[in-house]
Amino acid sequence: MILQELQLSHYRNYEELAVTFAPGINVLIGENAQGKTNLLEAIYLLAFTKSHRTAKDRELIGWHQKLARVSGVVERASGRLPLEVQISTSGKRVKVNHLFQKRLSTYVGNLNVVLFAPEDLALVKGAPVNRRQFMDMEFGQMSSKYLYNVSRFNQQLAQRNAYLRQFKYGQQSDRILLGVITDQLASVGGEVVVARQQLVKRLGKWAAELHHHISKQKEELSLQYVSQVEVDDQTTEEEAVAQLRRLYSENEEREIEHGTSLIGPQRDDIHFIVNGQNVQRFGSQGQQRTTALAVKLAEIDLMKEQTGEYPLLLLDDVLSELDDDRQTHLLTAIQDKVQTFITTTSLSGVARQLIHHPTIFTIQSGTLTKEEN
């Protein structure tokens, strides 16, 4: 898929912007604090309806304004598709093909993107919550069912946790109602667990091939999905649900004592294993970066496999974090295949040599200027 056009209105430091992008590699050059990352963030928001940098939507609205608008036209295999996200002080609204959508979950998946930024190294060396967020954001683009189930699970988890807190402090004592809430949570949780197992395995297949190539055949990478539910390729949703129900039953008293759910997909993780060792704990910084790069490139191939179309790739000041060798592997892998947006203070070295016919924009104080070839 291709993002052909992007329009911004009162978004961060952009008062008004209308730009047409090239289908290949688009390079956004500018000094810090000029708006490069804001532009990539707007593309990300057009895909996910939210920022990857802040949970406070008010920060996205321009100074002294009440409404920010991000809209664009996506060229998909099925044709042109207009998308729009409106952010106001009172909430958020989205449009697909000029029609408002009742639920945000029906919007995600119309524009697929893979973001690679310096902070994405936390995917490998950070806390498990980073990897759960990664699964939900990336797998949610590929499967509307997965996104819907994760949304349902989080809502029901919050409800159960609130009820467990009331139990802890003696404000509730209805075990039958707790059982009903728990049964509902287990039903959707089992579906989430099985979907994650299947998708992590497929992602791992692509990541292993890429990592083997990037490491020059010196290292072997595997991804292990870690869950309290014992799942493998043959586990059905019904079996996972039954396991969760049993685990909740066995741990009910302990959960009441803690006032929160101790069992479920909200405790899941992914382990990255390089040559038999957990790279999160024992890997060098170079191994962690190679792993992060392999996983990000694997996302692209998995999305193509799942949806039939390549996603957009957003590279936010990430080239400066990679050595020449890793830059070469990254740029070679995406060349002439994926519409890419690169932010940088300058295009030099390996990147300038490897990028074929880039479309270059300079950004200064929220103003975008296309360089003539």
From Swiss-Prot:
Q: Which GO terms describe its biological process?
A: DNA replication; DNA synthesis involved in DNA repair; double-strand break repair; SOS response
SUPFAM superfamilies given in the database record: P-loop containing nucleoside triphosphate hydrolases (SSF52540)
Which GO cellular component terms, listed alphabetically, does the Swiss-Prot or TrEMBL entry include? cytoplasm
Compartment(s): Cytoplasm
* MF annotations from Gene Ontology: ATP binding; single-stranded DNA binding
**Signal peptide, first to last residue:** none
Identify the residues that bind ATP.
30-37
Q: Does the keyword DNA repair apply?
A: yes
What are the entry keywords? Answer: ATP-binding, Cytoplasm, DNA damage, DNA repair, DNA replication, DNA-binding, Nucleotide-binding, SOS response
Q: Which HAMAP family match?
A: RecF
Physiological role: The RecF protein is involved in DNA metabolism; it is required for DNA replication and normal SOS inducibility. RecF binds preferentially to single-stranded, linear DNA. It also seems to bind ATP.
- What family does the entry list? Belongs to the RecF family.
What protein name applies here? DNA replication and repair protein RecF
The organism named in the record is Limosilactobacillus fermentum (strain NBRC 3956 / LMG 18251)
- List the gene name: recF
